Amino acid sequence: MFARIATLVSAGLVIGMLTPPPATTFADSPKAVAANGIVKVKSAYGMDETIARLKADIAKKGITFFTQIDQDKLAAATNIKIGPSVLLIFGNPALGTQFMTRNQEAGIDWPVRILVYRDATGQVFAEYTDFVWIARRHGIVSDDAPFKMANEVIGSITSSVVK
């Protein structure tokens, strides 16, 4: 009987751990943040124009643009179809590395990335990870100011694709 109870309790704990928390809006984040930390912005433009606008705004802000990865092209080379999907990678090393001084594992989330993709209905989106969520993910809770500032910057960048 105790073994059965232990099994049920263990199963309940595992299910509880696997169940994602509800969507969250961080008090100081400009947009609703999904439970996984993703901020999804609906673009008013097609893929090429969305990418061009984002890259132009990144450059205008003096942020280093590292590269873009055409994920659909990579998938097609292996005979896999995923649809238009481009990952933009950019950042400000002086700021990003400051985040990593608080927890070096936070480097998994830097440089900054925006995923631009077109869904099955033809709608283009730009997605990124909320910086306050990243801070919480890595146990950085002492000072939210730089993360809030980073949210403002990326929010400004993605606003360039919204009418």
Task: For the regions a language model picked out, list residue spans one by one.
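Beta-strand/loop substructures that line and gate deep hydrophobic ligand-binding cavities in soluble
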Residues: I114-G139
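Compact, glycine-rich, soluble single-domain proteins
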Residues: K55, A59-V112, V116
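Extracytoplasmic/secreted envelope proteins and their assembly/folding machinery
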Residues: D48-I51, K55, D72, N151-G155
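C-terminal partner/receptor-binding element of secreted or periplasmic proteins
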Residues: F131-K163
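Terminal, regulation- and interaction-focused segments at domain boundaries
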Residues: F26-F65, K163
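Bacterial N-terminal signal peptides that target proteins for export
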Residues: M1-V9
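Small-molecule pocket liners
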Residues: G37, V86, Q123-V124
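Bacterial N-terminal signal peptides
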Residues: L8-P21
